[in-house]
Structure formats: structure tokens, C-alpha cells
Amino acid sequence: LAAGLVSCGLKAKNSNSGEKDTTEAISSETDKKLEKLESLINQYYLKDVDQDELQQGIYEGYIAGLNDPYSVYYDEEATKSFQESTDGEYDGIGAVMSQNKETGIITISQVYEGSPAEQAGMKDNDILYKVEDEEVTGKDLTEVVSKIKGEKGTDVNLTVLRGDDREEVAVTATRDTIEYPTVSSKMLDNGIGYLRITEFDSVTYDQYKNAYNDLKNQGMKGMVVDLRSNPGGSLSIVCKILDEILPEGKIVYTQDKNGKEEDFTSDEEHQIDIPMTVLVNQYSASASEIFAGAIQDYDLGAIVGTQTYGKGVVQQIFDLKDGTCVKLTIAKYFTAKGQDIDGKGITPDVAIDYQADENNPEADNQLNKAIETLQGEMQ
């Protein structure tokens, strides 16, 4: 246990006054206390002890001691899931599942178009009843999803309940590599293209390019980019997309603990030639704010919606070489014009709160305002 902690220790500089190395002192005291705690647990603790769980708890607690919500230790299972989410793809059946906390019922909330799940006959709102003849209601959702995922080309047998009469339907899906759909698009009236980005993952750039080119081929003359509730993602991917939009210049820059700055820039090869607006809300964070901030700094379109989240820091993943990893905050970022948005967010040019319409669930007053604003620029 102690060795794992020491290997993750934060190094402190020795002072010129000959004082004891702070890191060594902290590590030594930590070793002693851990040994004492281990002795007390072995001697007095009533219940059985899972040593793996205990060890993981130490690592998690060590990073939690930084009091930084963005710095996190991931165990092996969490590391694998995190890697899948950042890669934007996984081997599975292509269905999004949610679980009712009270009943334990697992529902198929979305079946991806063209996925193995769709080909097997699964539908949105099906209830997942069995996986390989084992009932899953009330089981941990993460464990259930892990059983459904598997090697590409292998089959998984599922039973779903469908409709009000809960008809039992057996399906067999052949697992394949599934790409998370992070970009969706459609043409609206009057030559306005709508493009929604839910996250900036490894697959997002190609999905953006395909969606943008498809809208242009349909005659798009103005574009609404919807980043509402987009939590962020990859710094390099959002910069790659912005390189397709901005003129030559700085996109964003970062500054580490030593004051070292790194610029991320766009070249002169690409630049958007149509007006645009960007939709944001209080859940638009990190890479979403980099996108909105760049559009705002270059005056390429109005930012519409509410104040964004205010996550102006950058994290890096460090592989711990044992199947686990740690994510640490390593720098702050600033927009091209030097805006520090950490804890503040991006202030929209056109402020408007979302208002639900009970008579028309499909109504979207924020989108309507973005379209209205864009039409003013298109005239």
C-alpha cells in the first residue's frame, strides 16, 4: 500500500536552508500511519476486508485530497470505460441504456441507427429483461452493460419486454465496433443548417466534417451550432474543428504552474464563409467554452443562451502502467483575447433562458432566438 502512495507522491523542492525534504517527510509519516491503520483493522475490524477495495480507496483518497473535482484516480474498470468514452468507440451493440433507481428496471433509451441492436430488432423504450437468460432487473447497470459489450463478431442473447402488455421478445445481436454519435445535423427552413455537438471526442472531428459538408451540399447559407449541455472533451479536437472555421490566428492558449504558455492556432487554409450562431447553456463546459469563446473573440457569430459553466482548466491523463490511470489538472486556458473564464463562464451576446412549453414539448425558444439572430445576419 505504501509503495503505491509513494510512487504517486507530489515532489517538493528542497530549500537552500538544508531543511528536510518535504515529500520524504510526508511519505514517511504516511507509511507509519498506514501501517498503524492496517494493524488496527486486522486486530479490531468486525467485517471481512477486501484488500483490493481498500487499496483502491487509498489511491482515490490521495487524489481526492487535492480538493480538485477534475483530478481523479481511475481503477481498472473505470479506466477502460473512460478510455472508451474519449476514444468515441467501443465493441458492443449500439444501444443507450438507463436504469430507474427505484424499480431497478433497465430501459433501452436509444438504439443507434444502423447498429447491431437495430439490426437485431431492438427498439427505443424496450425494457431489458435478460442477458444470456439471466434476469437483470435490479442488477448494477455498469455490470449489465459490461456483459453486453464484448469482442467484435461475437453474439449476445438478450430478452426485452415491449409495449404496455410487456411482450417478451428474444433477440440476438452480433457485436461490432460502435462509434458514439457525437454530432447530429439537419436542414431547417430558409437555408439554415442546424448542427449539434454533444461532446468533443476522437470521432467528433470526422463527424463534424461529414455533417458540415452534407449541410453545405443541401444549400446551407447560415449555421446554428448547438453546444448546450456539451460537457467538453478533447482540447486538440475542438481546436481541430475551430481550425476549419477561424481565420489564421490564435485559438486558445494554456498556462501551466510554472507560467509556461502554449498556443493553439488556426491556419489560413480554412475559414467559414457563412454567418453562424452558437447555442450554449449553464452545462456547456470546457471545450464547449473554448469553441464559444473563439467564435466570440473573432466576432464570427452571436453566442445565444445562458452563462456557460466556467471550466477554464485543462487535464492530462497519466497511465500508471497497471491498467489504472490518474487525471490531473495541469494548466489553465485563456481565449484568444486573454479571457480567463474559470469559475466565470462565457457571457452570451444574446441572453435567453430556456422555457418549456407544456402544450408543445418540441418547442425550443432558445433555438428560435438563435435562428432569429442568424436571420438578421443573413439579410
Model-predicted segments: where are they?
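Short, well-ordered strand-loop elements centered on a beta-strand within folded domains, enriched
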Residues: 103-112, 167-172, 252, 325-327, ...
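Intrinsically disordered, Ser/Thr/Pro/Gly-rich linkers and terminal tails that flank
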Residues: 1-99, 130-131, 136, 141-187, ...
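PDZ/PDZ-like domain segments forming the peptide/carboxylate-binding groove
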Residues: 88-130, 134-138, 202-205, 332
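Cleft-lining beta-strand/loop regions that shape enzyme active-site pockets
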Residues: 109, 118, 132, 142-311, ...
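Conserved P-loop NTPase
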Residues: 315-319, 326-357
